[in-house]
């Protein structure tokens, strides 16, 4: 097995990734006084999410007229301490999200309303992952303190970056399949997922093709960019980039991160 397995599955729309989950029955409504029927709002009532989670409103019918979209946006109110600014993004004709300009305060409650409907959600600890393409590392901080899994015994002193708090040896995309630089939000967590290169145009029987089951997969884009376990890439972790774009970790590090991170926590990829 070559150490270049990547990280693609069937393409799905970002709205589907973000909005997946049970509808909050307190927010399912018929036509409201402001004129638009709301199907669901995320996060759901009482849900604990990461500090970068957007507020996502799904309407029961498409809204395409610019004036109507502005009216729908004005009906969305978000209250937090301290007060937050943000921007609206339409993911589809019936889905709009409000993205805060900075991270929500950790361990806090956010109140939101859409017209006459109201709800609230909570944020957990600020679990921030930073992938460095040039340093071949994935560094995780929790509430501003760099943390990571305890080393196994006997401690692997030969491991790259051993003893550096929160720093995990990683491997990102090789030159042909670079990991895109940018800021992302955790969309979902999958204990095991099938990754298939044909979903990104690489036949499975191609020399670069693959189809395999991957553990501890944390999805950060709708097109299949993940932080995940990659035991086949152990010799490259911390030393070189060999994946098809995903952030590859050891099984132990991937399991720890999978258990620590919430949906909505940020992942930052930098050179």
From Swiss-Prot:
Record's CDD domains? YkuD_like (cd16913)
Catalytic residue positions: 228 (proton donor/acceptor), 246 (nucleophile)
Classification via PROSITE patterns: LD_TPASE
The UniProt keyword set, sorted, is: Acyltransferase, Cell shape, Cell wall biogenesis/degradation, Peptidoglycan synthesis, Transferase
Give coiled-coil spans as residue ranges: none
Report activity regulation: Is irreversibly inactivated by the beta-lactam carbapenems via the formation of a covalent adduct resulting from acylation of the catalytic Cys. Imipenem is the most efficient drug for in vitro LdtMt3/Rv1433 inactivation.
- List the Gene Ontology MF annotations in alphabetical order: acyltransferase activity; peptidoglycan L,D-transpeptidase activity
Q: Which InterPro entries match?
A: Big_10, LD-transpeptidase, LD_TPept_cat_dom, Transpep_catalytic_dom
Which superkingdom is the protein from? Bacteria
Q: L,D-TPase catalytic domain spans which residues?
A: 127-270
The UniProt record lists the EC number as 2.3.2.-
Its recorded name reads Probable L,D-transpeptidase 3
Q: Which organism is it from?
A: Mycobacterium tuberculosis (strain ATCC 25618 / H37Rv)
């Amino acid at each position: 097995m070559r150490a270049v397995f990547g990280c693609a599955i069937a393409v799905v729309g970002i709205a589907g990734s973000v909005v997946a989950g049970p509808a909050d029955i307190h927010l399912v409504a018929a036509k409201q006084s402001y004129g638009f029927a709301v199907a669901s709002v995320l996060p759901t009532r009482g849900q604990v999410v990461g500090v970068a989670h957007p507020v996502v409103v799904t309407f029961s019918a498409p809204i395409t007229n610019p004036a109507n979209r502005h009216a729908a946006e004005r009906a969305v109110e978000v209250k937090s301490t301290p007060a937050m600014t943000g921007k609206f993004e339409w993911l589809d004709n019936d889905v709009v999200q409000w993205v805060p300009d900075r991270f929500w305060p950790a361990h806090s409650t956010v109140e939101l309303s859409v017209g006459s409907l109201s709800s609230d959600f909570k944020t957990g600890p600020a679990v921030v992952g930073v992938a460095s393409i040039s340093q071949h590392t994935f560094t995780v901080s929790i509430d501003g303190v760099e943390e990571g899994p305890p080393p196994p015994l006997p401690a692997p002193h030969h491991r790259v970056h051993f003893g550096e708090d929160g720093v995990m040896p990683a491997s990102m995309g090789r030159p042909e399949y670079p990991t895109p630089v940018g800021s992302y939000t955790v969309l979902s967590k999958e204990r095991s997922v099938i990754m298939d290169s044909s979903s990104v145009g690489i036949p499975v029987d191609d020399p670069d093709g693959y189809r395999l089951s991957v553990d501890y997969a944390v999805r950060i884009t709708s097109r299949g960019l993940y932080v995940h376990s990659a035991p086949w890439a152990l010799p490259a972790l911390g030393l070189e980039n060999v994946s098809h774009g995903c952030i590859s970790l050891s099984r132990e590090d991937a399991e720890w991160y999978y258990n620590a991170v919430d949906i909505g926590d940020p992942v930052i990829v930098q050179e």
